[in-house]
From Swiss-Prot:
UniProt-annotated binding residues for Mn(2+) 1: Q284, E298
Organism, as annotated: Thermomicrobium roseum (strain ATCC 27502 / DSM 5159 / P-2)
Disulfide pattern: none
Family in the record: Belongs to the CarB family.
Cofactor note: Binds 4 Mg(2+) or Mn(2+) ions per subunit.
Protein name: Carbamoyl phosphate synthase large chain
Residues reported in the UniProt entry to bind Mg(2+) 1: Q284, E298
Binding site for Mn(2+) 3: Q826, E838
Start and end residues of each stretch annotated as Allosteric domain: 936-1078
Gene: carB
Lineage of producing organism: Bacteria, Pseudomonadati, Thermomicrobiota, Thermomicrobia, Thermomicrobiales
Annotated Mn(2+) 4 binding sites: E838, N840
């Protein structure tokens, strides 16, 4: 008989907003843990500041708090809920750091809360670089020469004994924040300063660099009985020196000898035992490729990004098992839900190869530093599974959804052999393509391996792909050659390009030959036992393990890798859609390739296919599922997967696939500028003057006709990619010359830029009625991307006459488009007139936020509409949903510290990676919470630097007075200080422009003499460059930096209005009329 759990109620700490280094993997692990705890009859309480997560849905826990993740807020929740246990190892670095802080503040002892799973001492010993080093020496594990430093002087003394290159690793940080590789003493000084600032305990480890060694990871689990197992070992294709989150990785390892494998496995088990970790843990090793010498690099004493990958790669539900171990279960008494027959103590086995490739944001940040090092830069990742490494690699490349859809892409600079050699030596996001380019030129695998540090085994595998490219380009396309190419993962599109024909012709030839993929099971046991999970991947073999589902079914297209502009919000929508289909008796088939997310969990849908989200792969799955008595091709839902899914709609419709919801013609109408202009004109709804243009001449003529400034953007993009506000003709010419805006062949949209209040509506349409759950008002004026704006629900200061106009326009547009399901419309209120900016006939990134604050389960309702149920059938009616007795603010969260060379200035191109929410009874309290949750709160009474553009100075006077009233001494650049003093505002310190005196503006930031920066960008060359350096310095020192006066004024308003005295309550309590204070 199973023993009673250690506790009857548990508080789970979430990881907060999505940032580089801490992404959707913690929504996945937290959601799994909450389900596992509920299975055990335990009362669950979740706290997270991120409204876009599945884990903060009200049905996920007994009490759901969307509140700032601070010690003070957590203590209030603990005092109210009185949990017996705290589970912090599923909330990433945020969860771990908060657990340590709660313990050190005496909160856990004061309320009798037990820290579950990994003990506090084990967390400290793994995270504190000095304690970890001492532990490794105690157990006889090899340790690199290193020094735990608390100052630059410490580090420089170490550099005298061990010269650069040196690695700098800050303690208690995520994604290598603040760290890096120092190749000189000057670089060492910069990195140590940055690392000490990033570490919550002001500590960095400085160690000898092992550049070029192999990086190997083991995912290990241990229970309270000291039973330990390895789940998976992972090999980084990139050698040491590149953060594992930025490395291409392969599971299981491909180049280790059995002796090396067993040696590192034994070391991993010894380390997890010595630390006393209970649950999951990730251990990273460096292995000398020329000997069996290894070093332990670090341990993550928690579920991590690698755990999510290992989980999806093996099918073993690590987070679920870790949660059960934390409450006292042991591995030998927990059934493996994947097989239903083995226990969790049974080590997984793989009979396939898994490849993960990171998704970097350099398509958004063309001027960002593409070099990869020990500080992570990727926003997301894709996973591909196949029977061989070559096929899995090619699938993963296709899944990235970049312009480089295969390995044939080359940078034109690589025509120069020295540039190609440089591209191999220096790790960047493009190095994989450089390897293929070098092999095409006849460079030997050994030479390429020596230059790049990538093992020869992997280089030879890429050489086999290059050889197949050459055969496909030159030989007759026989059935045997096509079969071989498909076995190696070549897409129809790539084969067509190599043979200068069309993808459709290759597909027709392939299908005529009867060449189609079969689908294999991911079962944790290499088919040793029958599996119960419906989790499949495609491969070109003979035996199929996935008979088509023989029941009513629908396919949900997921959102692919997390990237700026398309984040976790769309995974939320996909999962909620699958759940709604399941409840309606329709089998939900999920297609996605993101290993971090809930949607690729083995039980998030009735059937999961891990596949690239391109037309070929999706159509192959649909054809496979079509051979059922219920339908020809199963219907597909594209409105929940962001732009990824919408961009597939045209190809799917052309192939005869039934699309549930808004049809393809309406999707095209919303994206086609000329059609959309006519459409709104016929409805009598205003929009900013503009046009879709296809040439430079048309662009210049349109801009002159409507008048500068203009907003310029490509069509069919998400997140405002390559969008810009342009003020002058020469600026427009430069933009069109450098952005590649005309490259897609689709029109570039040019609109008059209207400087007004931006408003946003998400609505539900069943073809007869339109429900508007809520209207959101952006704090920043139009011109700042909606994803980077603070959004407020309800639009608290919008006159009712404009509310009525918004609801009327939304209703007319949705009905005229014949929309079905969700639709998102963005408006601008300019000089008393409401204009339509854009219409998106799909789910938007605000759907999770609005669903949670209004109580309308928008994705569930939309899915039921797609299945034929009207709003009335579901108990809703058209019009504006009753306003809730609360105010909620969605705040953008940025990861700029990780991206050198990228400006934090807000504009029409989206830059934020995640979001946080503040919710309360008043606007000021909700706003103050949003700033706190987003990490933008300025330390009370600390000096604030003001450096304002000329056209912002007059508006900055009131802001400066507000800051003074709050007790913030003012520091200002010369022009701003002069203006403020002339208007009676005292400035404590005037600083010179960069390089024009002492102290200058950079010095006060770099020396942390200010704790907040408000810098609005000017438009002449000098101030543009100075502003960039000011903003970068603030970000790299971890100092809150605001670039919009609207945002800064909102912060001051919140604090002056008493926003710091906010309430803390479960989410549903805010929607009741009675205020419950805690």
């Amino acid at each position: 008989m199973a023993r009673q759990p250690l506790v009857s109620s548990v508080l789970v700490i979430g990881s907060g907003p999505i940032v580089i280094g801490q992404a959707a993997e913690f929504d996945y692990s937290g959601s799994q843990a909450l389900r596992a705890l509920r299975e055990e009859g335990i009362r669950t309480i979740i706290v997270n500041s991120n409204p876009a997560t599945i884990m903060t849905d009200e049905d996920m826990a007994d009490a759901v708090y969307i509140e700032p993740l601070t010690v003070e807020v957590l203590e209030r929740i603990i005092a109210r809920e009185r949990p017996e246990g705290l589970l912090a190892t599923l909330g990433g670095q945020t969860g771990l750091n908060l657990a340590v802080a709660l313990a050190e503040a005496g909160v856990l002892d004061r309320y009798g809360v037990r820290l579950l799973g990994t003990p506090l001492e084990a967390i400290r010993r793994a995270e504190d670089r000095q304690l970890f080093k001492e532990l490794l020496l105690e157990i006889g594990e090899p340790v690199l020469e290193s020094l735990t430093a608390y100052s630059v002087e410490d580090a420089l003394r170490f550099a005298e004994e061990v010269p650069p290159p040196l690695i700098v690793r800050p303690a208690f940080t995520l994604g290598g924040t603040g760290g890096g590789i120092a190749f000189s003493e000057d670089e060492l000084v910069t990195l140590v300063q940055r690392g000490i600032a990033a570490s919550p305990i002001g500590q960095v480890l400085v160690e000898r660099s092992l550049l070029g060694w192999k990086e190997i990871e083991y995912e290990v689990m241990r229970d309270a009985n000291d039973t330990c197992i390895t789940i998976c070992n992972i090999e980084n294709l990139d050698p040491m020196g590149v953060h594992t989150g930025d490395s291409i990785v392969v599971a299981p390892s491909q180049t280790l000898s059995d002796r090396d494998y067993q040696m590192l496995r034994s070391a991993a088990l010894k380390i997890i035992r010595a630390l006393g970790i209970v649950g999951g843990c990730n251990i990273q090793f460096a292995l000398d490729p020329r000997s069996d010498q290894y070093y332990v690099i670090e341990v993550n004493p928690r579920v991590s990004r690698s755990s999510a990958l290992a989980s999806k790669a093996t099918g073993y539900p690590i987070a679920r098992i870790a949660a059960k171990l934390a409450i006292g279960r042991t591995l030998d008494e927990i059934p493996n839900p994947v097989t239903g027959k083995t226990m969790a103590s049974f080590e997984p086995a793989l009979d396939y190869c898994v490849v993960k490739i990171p998704r970097w944001p350099f398509d958004k940040f063309r001027h960002g530093d593409r070099r990869l090092g020990s500080q992570m830069k990727a926003t997301g990742e894709v996973m591909a599974i196949d029977r061989c490494f070559e096929a899995a690699l090619q699938k993963a490349v296709r899944g990235l959804e970049t312009d480089q859809t295969d390995l044939t892409w080359e940078d034109s600079r690589w025509q120069d052999p020295s540039a190609l050699e440089q591209a191999l030596r220096i790790p960047t996001d493009q190095r994989l393509w450089a390897v293929a380019a070098a092999l095409r030129r006849g460079w030997t695998p050994e030479h390429v391996s020596a230059l790049s540090g990538i093992d020869t085994w992997f280089v030879r595998a890429i050489q086999r792909l290059v050889e197949m490219e050459q055969r496909l380009a030159s030989e007759p396309l026989t059935a045997e050659l096509l079969w071989e190419a498909k076995r190696l993962g070549f897409a129809d599109r790539t084969i067509a390009a190599l043979r200068t024909t069309t993808e459709q012709e290759i597909r027709a030839q392939r299908l005529a030959l009867g060449l189609a993929p079969v689908y294999k099971l991911v079962d944790t046991c290499a088919a040793e036992f029958a599996a119960e999970t419906p989790y499949f991947y495609a491969t070109y073999e003979d035996e199929n393990e996935a008979p088509p589902l023989d029941s009513p079914k629908a396919v949900v297209i997921g959102a692919g890798p997390i990237r700026i502009g398309q984040g976790i919000e769309f995974d939320y929508c996909s999962v909620k859609a699958a759940q709604a289909l399941h409840r309606a008796g329709v089998a939900a088939i999920m297609l996605n390739n993101n290993p971090e997310t809930v949607s690729t969990d083995f039980d998030a849908s009735d059937r999961l296919y891990v596949t690239p989200l391109d037309a070929e792969s999706v159509l192959d799955v649909l054809r496979h599922e079509a051979s059922s008595q219920y339908d020809q091709l199963p219907p597909v839902i594209v409105q929940f997967g962001g732009q990824t899914a919408i961009n597939l709609a045209a190809d799917l419709a052309a192939a005869g696939v039934p699309i549930l919801g808004t049809d393809q013609d309406a999707i095209d109408l919303a994206e086609d500028r000329r059609r959309f202009e006519r459409f709104l004109h016929e409805l009598g709804i205003p929009q900013p003057p503009g046009a879709g243009v296809t040439t430079l001449e048309e662009a210049l003529e349109t801009a002159e006709r409507i008048g500068y400034p203009v907003l310029v953007r490509p069509s069919y993009v998400l997140g405002g990619r390559a969008m810009e506000v342009v003020y002058r003709r020469e600026h427009l010419e430069q933009y069109l010359a450098t952005s590649g805006a005309f490259a897609s062949g689709r029109p570039v949209l040019i609109d008059k830029y209207l400087d007004g209040i931006e408003l946003e509506v998400d609505a539900l349409c069943d073809g007869h009625e339109v429900l508007v759950p809520g209207i959101m008002q952006h704090i920043e004026r139009a011109g700042v991307h909606s994803g980077d704006s603070f959004a407020v629900y309800p639009a608290v200061e919008l006159p009712s006459v404009h509310v009525d106009t918004l609801v009327r326009y939304t209703t007319e547009i949705a009905l005229a488009l014949a929309a079905r399901g969700l639709i998102n419309i963005q408006f601008v209120l300019h000089q008393g007139v409401v204009y339509v900016l854009e219409v998106n006939p799909r789910a938007s990134r605000t759907v999770p936020f609005l669903s949670k604050v209004t109580g309308v389960p928008m994705v569930d309702v939309a899915t039921q509409i797609l299945l034929g149920r009207s709003l009335g059938d579901q108990g809703y009616r058209g019009g504006l949903w009753p306003r809730q007795p609360l105010v909620a603010v969605k705040a953008p969260v940025f990861s700029m510290a990780k991206l050198q060379g990228v400006d934090v200035q807000l504009g029409p191109e989206m830059k934020s990676t995640g979001e946080a929410m503040g919710i309360d009874r008043t606007f000021e309290a909700a706003l103050a919470k949003a700033f706190l949750a987003a990490g933008l709160a300025i330390e009370r009474g600390a000096p604030v630097l003001l450096s304002l553009a000329d056209n912002d100075k007059s508006a900055g006077v009131e802001l400066a007075r507000g800051l003074l009233a709050l007790g913030h001494p003012l520091v200002a650049t010369e022009g701003t200080a002069r203006y403020l003093r002339a208007h009676g505002v005292p400035v404590e310190l005037t600083v010179a422009h960069i390089g024009h005196g002492h102290p200058d503006v950079l010095e006060v930031i770099l020396e942390r003499k200010v704790r907040g920066v408000i810098n609005t960008p000017g438009r002449d060359e000098g101030t543009i460059q100075d502003g960039f350096l000011i903003r970068r310095a603030a970000v790299e020192r971890g100092i809150p930096c605001l670039t919009s006066l609207d945002t800064a004024r909102a912060l001051v308003r919140a604090l002056l209005g008493g926003g710091t005295s906010f309430s803390v309550q479960p989410l549903p309590a805010y929607r009741t009329r009675e205020a419950v204070l805690a």
